[in-house]
C-alpha cells in the first residue's frame, strides 16, 4: 500500500518543470497505476505544463485509469481553448470511450 505522502512525492515530481521529462513521465505512469482520487488530482494539476507531449499523455493516462472521477478533468481540458488541439483531441477520445 502506498501512503498519501508517497503519492504526494510522486505528484510533485510530475508537476515540477525542473525535473527531466523522463522522470516526469515515470511519475505519470506510476500515478496511473496507483489510481484513485489522489492520483487523478496530481495528474490534473499537470495540465498547465508547457509540454504538449506530456499533456497529451496526461489525458491518455486518465482515460486508461477508467475512473469516472477523471471525467470532469477531461471535460475541462476538452473545453479549454487554450489547450493545444492534440491535447483536446485526446481528452475527447477518452470521453467518447467512457
Locate each region found by the language model:
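Amphipathic alpha-helical scaffolding segments comprising HEAT/armadillo-like alpha-solenoid repeats
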Residues: 2-15, 36-48, 67-79
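Alpha-helical segment of the N-proximal tetratricopeptide repeat
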Residues: 12, 17-34
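Short coil turns that connect the paired helices of HEAT/ARM alpha-solenoid repeats
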Residues: 14-20, 47-53, 80-86
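Structural signature of alpha-helical solenoid repeat scaffolds
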Residues: 32, 63, 96-97
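Generic detector of contiguous secondary-structure segments
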Residues: 52-63
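Short, intrinsically disordered, charge-balanced linker/junction segments flanking boundaries
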Residues: 88-98
Amino acid at each position: 500500500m502506498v501512503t498519501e505522502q508517497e503519492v504526494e512525492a510522486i505528484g510533485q515530481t510530475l508537476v515540477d518543470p525542473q525535473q527531466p521529462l523522463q522522470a516526469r513521465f515515470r511519475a505519470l505512469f506510476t500515478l496511473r497505476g496507483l489510481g484513485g482520487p489522489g492520483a487523478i488530482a496530481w495528474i490534473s494539476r499537470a495540465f498547465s505544463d508547457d509540454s504538449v507531449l506530456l499533456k497529451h499523455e496526461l489525458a491518455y493516462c486518465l482515460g486508461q485509469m477508467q475512473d469516472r472521477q477523471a471525467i470532469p478533468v477531461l471535460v475541462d481540458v476538452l473545453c479549454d481553448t487554450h489547450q493545444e488541439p492534440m491535447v483536446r483531441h485526446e481528452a475527447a477520445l477518452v470521453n467518447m470511450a467512457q
